[in-house]
Design a protein with these regions (language model features):
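Small-residue-biased structural context
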Residues: 1-168
Length: 168
């Protein structure tokens, strides 16, 4: 298996989260499986945020001029996502507005992904030594390996496919 840096690890998170939203929208509106998929997406978002907080943001602060500003902007976006997820926790798929709230969350997540992949990640790749990014990627993988030992679910299937391990 090819070892990747932290940026590639976080980009893989993005693809997994996008796939989960696609599955949510392809599942019939009245199907309670949508709630399970949303819970998985929320879990993936939480793991992604934890990896950013623990590994990415310290690297941004130390490697980039103005890194604190990047991190503050990311934290503000994360607070919006957290508030939206909390608003969905008490909803069921049968409640009016559930689908609209999920789509609003997806739009916010998509904006977060675009910002990271078009602004933050290229800047970090230029400003941070490759060996640092590799080391941080290894640390993220170690954390995730522990998490996956108990997780499973659709997100694990998507990760396996992205790693070349099978088809969805």
């Amino acid at each position: 298996m090819t070892r990747t840096d932290i940026i590639t690890e976080l980009e893989t998170d993005h693809r997994v989260i996008e796939a989960l939203f696609t599955w949510i929208h392809r599942t019939p509106i009245e199907d309670t499986g949508r709630e399970r998929l949303l819970q998985e997406a929320a879990g993936e978002l939480a793991r992604h945020a934890a990896a950013q907080e623990r590994y990415l943001y310290p690297a941004v602060r130390s490697c980039l001029p103005g890194g604190d500003g990047f991190v503050e902007k990311e934290n503000a976006g994360q607070e919006r996502l957290t508030a939206m997820l909390r608003g969905l926790e008490s909803c069921t798929v049968l409640e009016p507005g559930f689908d609209g709230r999920v789509r609003a969350l997806e739009r916010e997540v998509t904006q977060h992904i675009r910002h990271e992949e078009h602004d933050l990640f290229p800047t970090l790749r230029q400003g941070c030594p490759p060996e640092t990014l590799q080391r941080l990627g290894a640390q993220v993988r170690e954390d995730r390996a522990r998490d996956r030992a108990v997780a499973g679910g659709s997100a694990a299937t998507v990760r396996s496919v992205l790693a070349g391990g099978g088809a969805v």
